[in-house]
């Protein structure tokens, strides 16, 4: 479960959490979509990839026995940060997850929009793109390398 992020605990409690199953296959089974192929570049593939990456980050943090807190942020106009990783004594990590094989500036616009609200935060775009590069203030890199950037 990912709690919604807000600086105010009271406002955080009024927003709905996101639920993630321990295995993306369980979610597909419950949705009755196990026999439906997940095709790259589809909405279903993007959702499954985001689910998978979030689970890998949470599992790595659990394995490392870190005290990281995980949340997400969605505004009333549906701008979203897929994952906010709060690390004790260190700046937070703002994570955008994209299933694309080529990250483009349009993929990180929402993330860049939130940066003034999180001074000092580490903005990452994790994807299937094999190249590591900067896009504006955002570090775009393969999802596996993102775990190391977070300290996992």
Residue ranges of model-derived segments:
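Accessory nucleic acid-recognition modules appended to NTPase machines
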Residues: 1-91
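Short, surface-exposed loop/helix-turn segments at secondary-structure junctions
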Residues: 36-41, 97, 107-111
